[in-house]
Every structure is written in structure tokens, then in C-alpha cells.
Amino acid sequence: MKEGLNFIAIDFETATPKRASICEVGICVVRNGEVVETRSWLVQPEENLYSYWNMQCHGIRPEDTENSPSFPEVWEEIERLYLDEFDTFVAHNAPFDRSCLEHSAKLYRLHLPEINWQCSLKTARQVYDFGCNTLGYLCERLGIPEGTHHRAGDDAEMCARLFIQELKDSGLWIPYACPSLEDPCHRLSVRLEADSSYGPDARSLSSAAN
């Protein structure tokens, strides 16, 4: 897609601290600046192993995924249904989600297409001056409807709506005034670096704000 605001917001939940232990995937599809679809899949991580702290965070347990598809099965569906149309992924603390995808691809020997990654967390730090930039706090502060935190589908939709608002507030995208604007995601002056500037998954920090 070359016109309008088009992207997929994506969120991964993991069963253990290992980035390749994905146990849930959520996506939210945005076409021309509108949320048109939100989906999530439970995923059986390798050997269906979970850590206590990860279960405490998202509430997903081994019995929830014992009959779920593996990550390669879920990724094949996402790739088949969406990736011919979309080449931009948005995530909140994108280095975390990007790392989950890349580690899983390495584990399962999957070929990944070229993806343009954008980060609603880093964008928030550039556009706003709120001090706290967790997904829950930003959505509450900006009046964005909140779902169940740390469930992949709800987090993906919250991220999508947040990113749309960030682009509006930054002036990079004006709905209706410029409907043929080349995809603003590619114009966003946010470039991700493979460094530790984000620290651990920011969605898990300052839980009181969530």
C-alpha cells in the first residue's frame, strides 16, 4: 500500500524470559488511518514451558496453549493473509517485539520478509512530555479505549490507536486533508537502533500506571 496511513500493530507475549518463547500473538490492521481488524492467536511455545513471572504478567498458562498451533503455523497465516499488503509493523517498545520475531524465526528457521518497524514508545517520547510512557498510561492520558493489558490482541489495538494519535499530534498525518499522502510511517523521523536505550519491555515497567 502506498497511500494513506497503513500498517499492522503487533504484540507478542512470551512464556519465559526467552524471546523465542512466544505464547500469544496479536495484530491490529490499520487501513487509511482506520482500525479495520484485530486478531490474536494463542501459540504453543517450545515444549510448552512457562515461567512463573511471565504467567503472572499475562495470565496465560500451559493448559491454555497445550493444543495451540506452533509459532510457524501462526506466522504462516499472518504472512499469507497480510504481508503482501503491509510492510510496516508498529509496536510499543518495538525492539522487544522485533527481537521476539527474529529469535523465533531463527529457532524455527523461518525466512522473514523485509519489515519497516516503527515504535509507538519512542514516538511518544518525541511527541509528548508525559514522563511516563507505558502503553496503559499513554492510552489513559490520551483518552484511547483500553483493553486487557498484556493480552496480545488488546495491546496491539491500543498500540495502533496510540500510534495514529501520535502521528496526528506530531503533524505527520492529517486525516482527510491529505488522503493521498505517501505512507506517513515511512516519513516518520523515528529510526530504531539495536541498543539498550529501551531497557526491558517497557510494557512491564511502572505497572501501577497500567
Predicted feature residues:
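Conserved non-catalytic scaffold segment of RNase H-like nuclease domains
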Residues: M1-E114, D129-C132, G136-H150
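Acidic two-metal-ion nuclease catalytic site recognized across multiple nuclease folds
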Residues: M1-K2, R161-N210
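Ser/Thr-centric signal marking residues that sit
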Residues: F12-T14, S120, C159
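A structural signal for alpha-helix termini and helix-coil/disorder junctions
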Residues: D84, L107, Q126-D129, Q165-D169, ...
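Buried hydrophobic packing segments
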Residues: L101, T123, C159-F163
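Conserved beta-strand -> loop -> alpha-helix junction used to position metal-binding or nucleic-acid-contacting
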Residues: H111-A124
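Acidic, divalent-metal-coordinating active-site segment for phosphoryl/phosphodiester hydrolysis
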Residues: R151-Q165
